[in-house]
Regions:
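Histidine-anchored nucleotide/phosphate-binding helix
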Residues: 14
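Long hydrophobic segments that form regular secondary structure
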Residues: 8-9
């Protein structure tokens, strides 16, 4: 992808994924804070132009699904002849009408390291403590879960 500036690259990349990639379910975009503050129009244009049901800035796109409350589904416009990533959405806890997309934004660098990162050193411990909490809910299990995370 040829571009002479970061803002132009963002537009070229947006056009590429919209026009050349299959599916419309989710997209993740890494945007450094400095670029966001220096090029707010380019970032907003990217978010507006992306034809995906979920757009996550600096976050894993699966997080939009895992949160359960945001609407999750393919971008509107799919048909039975070209279903792409599906028709309609799931979750939508707040019963929002005619949702085009969910946009989720977080920091470029996360602390503590999210448990879904492959490099998280205690993900098995976190998962075990989370299952224990689900099995026998108790406020007393939370400190151990938080310390493992």
């Amino acid at each position: 992808m040829d571009a002479t500036s970061p803002a132009q690259f963002l537009q070229v990349a947006t056009d590429f994924v919209n026009d050349r990639m299959t599916g419309t379910l989710c997209a993740s975009v890494s945007i450094p804070p400095r670029f966001r503050s220096q090029q707010p129009d380019a970032v907003e244009r990217c978010l507006t132009d992306l034809r995906y049901g979920s757009v996550c800035i600096n976050q894993w796109s699966g997080l939009a699904y895992g949160l359960v409350s945001p609407p999750w589904g393919g971008y509107p416009g799919a048909t039975l002849d070209n279903v792409q990533s599906g028709i309609g959405n799931v979750h939508n806890t707040y019963l929002l009408d005619r949702v085009e997309k969910t946009v989720l934004e977080g920091p470029l660098v996360n602390f503590p390291r999210p448990v879904w990162f492959p490099s998280h050193s205690r993900s098995v411990d976190v998962a075990t403590r989370l299952v224990q909490l689900y099995h026998r809910p108790s406020m007393f299990r939370l400190p151990g879960l938080f310390s493992a995370a």
